[in-house]
Amino acid sequence: MKTLKKATNSFGLAVLLVVGGMQLSAADSATEVAAIHAADDVWVKAFNAGDVDTMVALYEEHAVLLPPGAPAANGRAAIRALFAKMAPAAAKDGLEFSLGAKPAGGARGDFGWSSGTYVLKDKTGHVIETGKYLSVSRKKDGKWLYVRDTWNSDGPPASTEPGAATKK
């Protein structure tokens, strides 16, 4: 009987710890998701300013960027090279990148993700592209860094018909 009572008490304690931990995890998760979204906001501001250094600092050393219609950029050096072509030119042309109003996200332990929509406007405010993104992050030394990042346009894919690029 003592063994059963001891096992029941142990089980009750385990349930209490798990349920209590779940509640703490939900609160912690909301805080972590907010931190992930804050990193997304830093990325957007840096892109719009053509600030490649700030953009690249948001990626882990061995992160992989998966741009649409192009090979993967593996590691910070390749990510820097890609963004060095994109961000300063976009800033110079007055393009404005923004994220949709309701991004999704989640966090569990040292991993988290964010997903949502984006809009790219020209300097007159005309929408030239809409799309969606998905980023996976890892928390390292208290900071969320992207480990995988991808996006794609809502527009139709480029034609694969031979000579389509030269047709009007």
Write out the residue ranges for each language-model feature.
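Short beta-strand edge/turn micro-motifs at domain boundaries
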Residues: 130-155
